[in-house]
């Protein structure tokens, strides 16, 4: 899960052009285990922005190092808030989904976030 947060942080801080704090990581769908010696790929994509926060979809894939295709391992969502030098929230640029795939991903990510908040 640390790699999930690391990839999410890298994506969020690049979009925010500065430091961020992790607000939420959840909605994890564990598909299969990572085996010892597997090559692991972690990919984070922006799915939504609010005034100071960013929602991301994070996907983990793994497979053998000898050319076997990578397979899905985990899908989850994460929310980060951009902060200034005093750790106060600061505004981020707006992002809007443009492709049908981006729109569908944004809707799925938001549904996971809403469900997790409702369960609290």
Region locations from a protein language model:
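A eukaryote-biased signal for short, well-structured alpha-helical docking elements
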Residues: 5-7
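HotDog/MaoC-like acyl-thioester-processing domains
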Residues: 35-36, 47-120
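A conserved, well-ordered hydrophobic junction motif at loop->secondary-structure transitions
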Residues: 1-3
